[in-house]
Amino acid sequence: MYQRLKEINFRKPLELEWNSIFLILGFFVLAAILIAWTQRPDEELLLERLKDLDLPIVGVGPNINVSESLEIGTQTYPNSPYVVPADRVPIVILPNSAINIIKSLPEAKISFEKEVYARHLAHLLLKKDQKIFSEPILNSIKQDLTRNISKTLDTLWDEVDYAFEKNIGTLPDDDDGWKNVSVYGKVLNVVALLSGRVFVGAPLCRDEEWIKATIAYTIILGVTVGMLWKRPWWQRKILAPLYFRTLVGVHKKAEELLKPLLEREAALDPSEWEKKAGEQNDGQLIRWLLSHTPQKGGKIDVKQLAHDQLTVSLAAIHTTSITISHLLYDLATYPEHVAPLRTELESVIADHKTAGGNGKLSKVELTKLWKMDSFIKESQRLNPPILVQMRRYLTSPLALPSGHILPSGTFCGVDAQMTNRTVPYYEASPITHQQTPFDTFDGFRFSKLRSVPGNENRYQFVTSSTESLNFGHGTHACPGRFFASNEIKIAFAEVLLKWDVRLKPGEGRPANLYTDTNVMPNMKGEVQMRRRELI
């Protein structure tokens, strides 16, 4: 026994240390793998289950061309479901006849939240039971922002000139005054300023660190989730802390920047908010968010409020920047639209001034810009932000008109791309003979359709219907689309009034980028812009 103790006592300390380290590391690696295994996602098993339903599968992975698969699938199976084995999860593409069935089904049966949560791998980033979009932020957008859109317009008009001057006006000119503009990067900054003015107000919205934080969160989240999806399912839980490290740092910076503003606003009585809102309209979202967020022990949850601000900024910056980038590319590509767009805009502004206005168009005046609205809608029709809309996760079996019954656990959606390009309602129009082919850009396609008596309030950019799915449709149609529409129109008006836009000499429209079901404007593309000589 004594000899055995001596052997133990006199073993090399370093050897003991390394053995212990390897033992501990081995334990944690094994534990991580076991945890990952127990949380194994079912996307890899889903395709096998769907094969049992005898659904046609269109496309072969990896790196499947989803756009091409949708075109083939919807043309081949227009009235029945089929499967696109997209890079992230196989998606059952529902026929358009199913739209009215799924649009209002409750979360307990067909879940929008679970689909978004799964697609963004939110279980690897958020706390248990934490939602991507909290109830306070949803209430702030659905109730307050939508109801107070008119009040936000003056704020946006005030900010838009500064945003363009800062990001485009300072670029160097060539001998003829043309500037090379990296479209997506500059538009991101413009939209961050515009949205920030409403969401957090000045001066924070112009703080370079805040702008960097909101843009970085938008970009890094998408890139990080994409990287994790490329890893085998069992590695994601292990690698997530490393991959999300930069994003967590951005979140902490946002908390640091927001904390003084949140504490200052939270200390005010609600009656003081109303008085303040009457004096200035910027930063309203902060107050609305606080009004819907219960305090815990008399304290505000800065971390959750920062998450809410970053999430809504992400949604606003991402989709709006995509739309405006496409608008600049299309305006440069189809210059024949510029003169009619300017004439319409200048006419509405002149009428506004004649009526005693200051030229900053109100919500009512913006609705008079039929040609502008049509141009924006046509640009989005051919360049939708996402190819599959009304995406849902089935939490119970779903019976379809085709006779198929989809099992719970299925990811499904509707083909927005082909709906945009083949919808039959165009054919029913009395002016069908004037319409250009569906695969051709016609910026005034929808203003012509609206000119038909009875169509005046149809075919608008914000329209959500079975014929127009780019904002979704039904219970979960994008609640922020009305604010986004006005923000886009104000930015587009700034371009039309003060800038000429053209493609770089000898170049065509920068090609879109397709990743999984997403469509992005070319992030390296450039156009040329020059200040207009205003008389």
Curated annotation (Swiss-Prot):
Transmembrane segments: 20-37
Taxonomic superkingdom: Eukaryota
Record keywords, A-Z: Glycoprotein, Heme, Iron, Membrane, Metal-binding, Monooxygenase, Oxidoreductase, Transmembrane, Transmembrane helix, Virulence
Record pathway: Polyketide biosynthesis
Binding site for heme: C478
Subcellular location: Membrane
EC number(s) reported in the record: 1.-.-.-
Glycan-carrying positions: N65, N148, N180, N420
GO biological process: secondary metabolic process
Keyword RNA-binding annotated: no
Enzyme class: oxidoreductase
Induction description: Expression of the botcinic acid clusters genes BOA1-13 and BOA17 is coregulated by BCG1 during both in vitro and in planta growth.
Keyword Iron: yes
GO cellular component term, pick one: membrane
SUPFAM superfamilies: Cytochrome P450
Membrane topology: Single-pass membrane protein
Cofactor annotation: heme
Family: Belongs to the cytochrome P450 family.
Protein name stated in the entry: Cytochrome P450 monooxygenase BOA7
